[in-house]
């Protein structure tokens, strides 16, 4: 019982504990379904933090009355979901640190698309389902203190299809020679 994102992270940390205790390498993929509809089930305390926020400055279209109220409510719920993910990522990092494995653990943080509502996408056009940058450009953060200096930025184009070959390359796994995949490191 509990909020889904919390449950996913709890299970991942239990799996990591078992792997570390058994002195085994581990791979954990935590795919939160947040922020995503349905938006009714969000942590109440986090929702309360955002429920009175006016989100109209980040909307790409002016809304009024009921439409603005409904969009503000939805965005408050999305903000609560994002905050919950942030808190869980923080818990995960603290957990890895406490286990003594953070330094040599690769953590990749990414999402799959832009917003599917009238939310701000910077100076980019489009949103989810659009092939414009506002619909397809998304962050990919790579954390590996033992090998990657913090603060580095890259403008290299990549996609989810590139994650597996990049991880295999980073871990010096030669499997791509015998089992080629699409994507590149």
State where each predicted segment sits.
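Active-site-proximal cap/lid insertion segments
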Residues: 1-181
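Catalytic-site signature of metal-activated, phosphate-bearing donor transferases
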Residues: 183-185
